[in-house]
Amino acid sequence: MKNLNIQNQKLKSKPIIACWGFFDGIHQGHQALFKQLLVNSTINNYQTCIISFDRKPQSVISNKNNEVLLSYEDKIKTIAKYNFDYYWEIKFSKEIATLSSEQFISWLLANNVKAVVVNPNIRFGYQGQGNIKTLQQSSLQVYLCNDIVVINNKVSSTYIKQLLQNKDISSANLCLQQEPYTISGKVVHGIKEARTINFPTANLSLLTNYALPGLATYITLTEVDNKWYQSMTVIMLRNNKPLVESYLLNFNQDLYGKIIKVRFLDFLRDNLKFTNLDDLKKQVDKDLVETIKYFANSSSKLLKS
């Protein structure tokens, strides 16, 4: 997959079929779009191109919170697995946001894009003025990819974030499909309270502004040096900032400074307030028992990355 940049390159290739979007999370809806892109490229003997953005368009247009489901690096790696011919990244700016739908279509045509795969409800161009009719009235071939519905809801990045915030990890993972929701962070020193009750945790400094699950304790897998370990992870607030801590089962190595991944599998319990360390230890002991039961009843496929 060849990476390009809209500001300094133009495609000189055989005809191209493309789709575009931010593709946050690469969820089931995105996966369906990608698969249809590949199918229609084979039928038409076109090369494939994914057109995406270096940041969420909403963060530029409306200054909304820029929380994401997937880090930039992981998004690129996931898209690369599909073996598309090109990945063309747009550096999204206020100037790009003012492009009309007609200007965007003209840019596609100028770069040898002959066909596109889109959702029937697509909106694009300045203030979302372009829609499916705009595309169909152009000289582009237009292929439609319908919404994917899971649990009676259209799969979207926004819906998945709502599920995570509501602590519905199993439904969020169903929408993501490819792998459970995963975050990455660097292990840093914390206040070491859990160590005093013999449950040392890895305190994460997150590498990306992730859309975190709601404040609670979760059953997770944690990856260290390319190996996955069963774990429990708590998301809490400290000094009004989200804090993520993971306890790895059967693990006693030094993690400080390491980059680790945490994969969320299921909700364990809501967070509780404890008046003393003895009560905290009793609860964590119970959590450990429930976590061990969970993994004993789960398929070994969970450990596959």
Regions found by a protein language model. Give the residues of each.
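Glycine-rich, Lys/Arg-enriched anion-binding loops that position phosphate/diphosphate groups
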Residues: 140-230
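N-terminal catalytic cores of NTP/NDP-binding nucleotidyl/phosphoryl-transfer enzymes
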Residues: 7-71
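A short acidic, often aromatic-flanked loop/helix-cap motif at beta-alpha or helix-coil junctions
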Residues: 9-12, 94-98, 148-154
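Residue-level signal for inorganic ion chemistry
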Residues: 27, 79, 116, 172, ...
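Phosphate/ribose-recognition catalytic cores of enzymes acting on nucleotide-derived substrates
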Residues: 189-305
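N-terminal Rossmann-like or analogous alpha/beta NTP/dinucleotide-binding catalytic cores
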Residues: 57-138
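Short acidic-hydrophobic, aromatic-tinged amphipathic segments that line or gate anion-handling sites
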Residues: 1-10, 88
